[in-house]
Each structure stands twice: as C-alpha cells, then as structure tokens.
C-alpha cells in the first residue's frame, strides 16, 4: 500500500521563499560559474563594526558565565544602551525597563507585532513599493493586505488622501487579498525608504501620527537607515504623542555595520511593549550574552566613527 502523501500547511501557498534569500542563491550560483557579479540583492554593509565592539565580544565570550540562557527582554546593559542611543541621536526619552524591547533583528519584530495586534481577517496597510516581509508575514498570519502607493512625484511619501479613502471604505478593492475590514489595524511605513531611497520627513511623521490618532490605527515605522543618507537622524517618536499610537523598529545592521549579529529593537509605550514581549517570550529565548554586551558597547561609538563609517563612506560611493 502506498504511503499517504503529507502536505504542507495551506498558508505556505500564500508566500514564496523570502525574496532576498532567493536572490542570494542566484548570485552565489552565478559566482560559482565564474561570472563577475555586482549584487543588488540584500543591502549588507561590507565594513566591519568598531574595534571596541569586536574586543567586547571576545572579552565576554571568554567569561564562563556568558553562555547560559539570557533574559528574553534583553540584558539591562543592552536595554540601557538602546535607551541612551535614542536620547543621544533622536532626543527621545525611553524607559529602558518598559518602553523598548531588543529583537533578533527587525524582521523578527514584524512577526511579533503582527501577532500582537492583528487578528486573522483584519486589514493591514502596506506601502507599495515596500519591504516584502510586511506583506508575506501578514499573509501567513491571515491578514488582508491593503496597499497604499508611494510615488516618485511625491518624494516617495504616503498619499494621505488615498489613505483616508481606504480607511473610509471608498476604495475597498485596491490592493486587497480579501474583504476590507471597516478599519485597518496596522500601517507599516519605512523611512528612509527601502527600496526607493525616499528620505524621512518630519512633516510626514507628523501626518502619520495624526492619522493614527484619528483612526485608532497603530503605525509601525521601520527605521534602520536613518544613519545612511544624511546627518539628520529622524524618528517618528520625536513627534509629540507618537509613543501612544506608534511603534518604531531600529537596527544595528546598517548604522553599526552589524547585519549578521541580528540585533534590533522596537520602541513604544509600555503597554504595547508588554503585548509584544508576551509574543516574543513564547517564540525565542534571548540572544547570546556576548552579542548583547558587545552591542551595548557599539552604541558608545563616537560621533567621528559614525561620520566616517556611515555618512562619508556612503556619500563617496554615491559619487563614484
């Protein structure tokens, strides 16, 4: 008798393998064939972290007590360093104990936030064009995807007239993967923008906060690139009242040349963070202590290090 075929879960039919995972395989295959490839796949800094970061990692890794399980919500040292980072660069006050949460990269945070705020069948507002994981994870979790457009003639900023039409239900068919709920639960935004390069604008952040407050929608700003395009570092949490209705992701991948370390964070009000932590604590068990303490050390990098490693280096390459 033939064995009965085992089938995957239905949700896998909704998505493909991660876009950049597929592209990296393609690039690796072409390199193996001897072709000279300029990879335009995932954006991965090719410069190292600061020397003090590497030295701290080695120091902690040699400590006998460094290799056990760590707190899911991160070590106090890392949380305090993240709070200090926001105060230093954005002039935003965050309680290190309750208003931020370390992540194993921002991509993990997209999953946790969607699980914490979105029920199956709810609608999620996703930028088009935009980072593909906002769409794929929302689909896996049974949400309706509603795209809002970013246009070059508008500096790749949201069209708030379109957003108002979507929320009012006057354009229910645009970009959906199912019936549009009366009010979307979540809006994803990302500035500086990937893939367009559109720059963050404080007036956009102010409009997003106003939109969130008026419609009871949580705005999630994915902010890993604020050290790349300019010396003006902006955060949506700089807007008064933003913490009550917004969540912001930040990451050390681009700002500190640490993409492989998988260290990110989310920041918001204490209640939102507690909901996200409830999800996170049931999925993962913390990050290696050496990585956490070395990341805390990296947050101490000098202004000069950031200027040379980020602003000047990328500015020179754009002129090449």
Where are these regions (language model features)?
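Conserved PLP-anchoring active-site segment centered on the Schiff-base-forming lysine
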Residues: 116-138
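Helix C-cap/helix->beta junction micro-motif
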Residues: 33, 141, 214-215
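N-terminal small-domain helix-loop-helix segment of the aminotransferase-like
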Residues: 2-105, 112, 298-301
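Conserved core segment of the aminotransferase class I/II
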Residues: 241-315
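Active-site phosphate-binding strand-loop segment of PLP-dependent enzymes
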Residues: 146, 150-234
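Aromatic/hydrophobic pocket-lining residues that form π-stacking "cages" and hydrophobic walls in ligand
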Residues: 23, 27, 134, 208, ...
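Short, intrinsically disordered, charge-balanced linker/junction segments flanking boundaries
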Residues: 164-168, 313-320
């Amino acid at each position: 008798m033939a064995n009965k075929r085992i089938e995957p879960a239905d949700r896998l039919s909704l998505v493909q393998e991660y876009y950049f995972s597929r592209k990296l395989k393609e690039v690796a295959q072409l390199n193996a064939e001897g072709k000279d490839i300029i990879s335009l796949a995932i954006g991965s800094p090719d410069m190292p972290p600061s020397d003090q970061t590497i030295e701290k990692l080695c120091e902690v890794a040699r400590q006998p007590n460094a290799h056990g399980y760590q707190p899911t919500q991160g070590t106090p040292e890392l949380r305090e360093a993240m709070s200090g980072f926001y105060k230093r660069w954005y002039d935003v006050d965050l309680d290190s104990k309750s208003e931020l949460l370390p992540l194993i990269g921002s991509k993990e945070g997209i999953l946790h936030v969607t699980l914490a705020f979105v029920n199956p069948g709810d609608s999620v507002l996703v930028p088009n064009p935009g980072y593909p994981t906002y769409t794929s994870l929302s689909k896996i979790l049974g949400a309706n995807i509603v795209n809002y457009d970013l246009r070059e003639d508008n500096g790749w900023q949201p069209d708030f007239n379109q957003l108002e039409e979507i929320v009012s239900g006057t354009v229910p068919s645009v970009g959906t993967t199912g019936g549009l709920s009366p009010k979307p639960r979540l809006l994803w935004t990302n500035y500086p923008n990937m893939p367009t390069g559109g720059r963050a604008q404080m007036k956009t952040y102010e409009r997003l906060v106003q939109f969130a407050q008026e419609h009871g929608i949580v705005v999630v700003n994915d902010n890993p690139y604020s050290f790349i395009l300019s010396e003006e570092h902006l955060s949506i949490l700089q807007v008064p009242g933003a913490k009550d209705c917004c969540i912001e992701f930040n990451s050390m991948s681009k700002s500190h040349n640490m993409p492989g370390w998988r260290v990110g964070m989310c920041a918001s009000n204490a209640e939102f963070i507690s909901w996200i932590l409830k999800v996170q604590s049931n999925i993962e068990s913390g990050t290696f202590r050496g990585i956490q303490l070395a990341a805390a050390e990296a947050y101490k990098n000098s202004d000069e290090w950031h200027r040379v490693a980020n602003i000047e280096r990328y500015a020179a390459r754009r002129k090449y």
